[in-house]
Curated annotation (Swiss-Prot):
Protein name: Phosphoribosyl-ATP pyrophosphatase
Subcellular location field: Cytoplasm
Statement: the UniProt record of this protein carries the keyword Nucleotide-binding: yes
Record-listed E.C. numbers: 3.6.1.31
Region (Disordered): 96-117
Catalytically driven reaction(s): 1-(5-phospho-beta-D-ribosyl)-ATP + H2O = 1-(5-phospho-beta-D-ribosyl)-5'-AMP + diphosphate + H(+)
One GO CC term, this protein: cytoplasm
Family per record: Belongs to the PRA-PH family.
Bias kind Polar residues: ranges: 106-117
UniProt enzyme class: hydrolase
Single GO term (MF): ATP binding
Length: 117
């Protein structure tokens, strides 16, 4: 089995390399050069397929569809010049923090909405 960080690095490098590839010859280049809505719709589609696989309790499909979802999320991140390491750092920051506490801290750090005058 390949190290998860190694495959993530290779996928990231491939996606970065495809930024300059011909969209006619590369699916990744096609998504990267298209309207962002195309990528976002693909993520929504893959998320829905992952949900359906979960509802069907189909382990193989859950794995397959989650891989598709993650892959398309990596493409979305690349469009915004966000590295997977930024996401991993955020997950690491949250590690060991209660989800309830983390959510509460976010709401406490939000400015109060102003009333429309």
């Amino acid at each position: 089995m390949t190290s998860s960080s190694t495959i993530l690095q290779r996928l990231t490098q491939t996606i970065e390399a495809r930024k300059s590839a011909d969209p006619a010859h590369s699916y990744i280049a096609k998504l990267l050069s298209s309207n962002e809505d195309k990528v976002l719709k693909k993520i929504a589609e893959e998320a829905a397929e992952t949900i359906m696989a979960c509802k069907d309790n189909d382990r193989e499909q859950i794995i397959y569809e989650t891989a598709d979802l993650w892959f398309h999320c990596l493409i979305m991140l690349a469009r915004h010049d966000i590295s997977p390491e930024a996401i991993l750092s955020e997950l690491e920051r949250r590690e060991g923090v209660s989800g309830i506490e983390e959510k509460l801290s976010r709401s406490q750090n939000q400015p109060e909405p102003t009333k429309a005058e």
